[in-house]
C-alpha cells in the first residue's frame, strides 16, 4: 500500500482523474467535478440527529434536536425563524400546517453566509428554487454574516427574522442562547424551523476509473468490505474520527445529484 496525503480535496480529485491514485478520500463537491474519471466506492457515515423530516412542523415539537448514536449518510440544512414579530408569524403559520408564500418569506430579513457556504447559502438557495422558483438573491432583505454563530446572535437579538444553517445548529447554541447570545427565553421557545432541505450526502471514498487495479469489480468489493470492517473496530474508528466519520456504507453516483445541482448554482453565482 502506498499512501500519500493530498494537499486538498481538489488535489485528490486530480490524482484520481489522472489514475495516479487508485482510491481517495474526497468531498461530495469535489467528487462531482471529477466524476467523469472516478466513481463512488463508499459513503461516509456520521452520527445523525433525532429529527429528519422534510416537514418543518415536525421539528417544532417543543424540544431541541438531540445527537443520537444512529448513523447517517447525509445531513440536512434548516431555515430557522426567530423571536422577532415576523419570525413568530412565520413559525405560527408553519405550525398551523399552512404553506408559506414567497411574499411571506420576502417580507422577512434573512441572515445568510457567503455564497460558497453549503449550509449557509447554497442548499437553502436550492430549497428556495425548488419551492418558489427564486433564490436568495431575489430576497429583498438579506444580511451576510461571517459565521453561523453571528447569524444565531442576530436572530436572538431580533436583528434578523430568519437564518439558514445546518440541522444541528440549535444543539450547539441552545445552552448559550440566553446567557451569551441575547435570547430572552429558552431557544426552543423563541425559534422554529420553517424549511428543511433535502439530504446532503457526506464525504466519500472514491475510486479512479483510470486505475487498472480498480477495474476489477471483485477487488473493489473486497476493498470496500475491508474499509467497512476496519471502521467497525475501535482502532479504525479512532483513525477515521479525524474526518468526523464513524463508519462507511456502499454508495452510488446518483446520491450526489444534489451536489451537482449545488455546483451548477455556484457556477451561476460566480458567472
Question: What role is predicted for each listed range?
Answer:
Residues 43-78, 180-221, 241, 245-247:
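Periplasmic-binding protein-like
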Residues 45-118:
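A conserved helix-loop-strand patch within extracytoplasmic ligand-binding domains
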Residues 2-6, 136, 141-142, 235-242:
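Surface-exposed patches in mature extracellular/periplasmic domains of secreted proteins
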Residues 94, 98-101, 106-216:
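Pocket-lining segment of extracytoplasmic ligand-binding domains
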Residues 3, 82-87, 209-213:
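Short loop segments at secondary-structure junctions
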Residues 11, 15, 20, 29-33, ...:
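Extracytoplasmic/secreted proteins, especially bacterial periplasmic and envelope-associated proteins
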Residues 5-9, 19-32, 36-38, 42-48, ...:
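Beta->alpha turn/N-cap motifs
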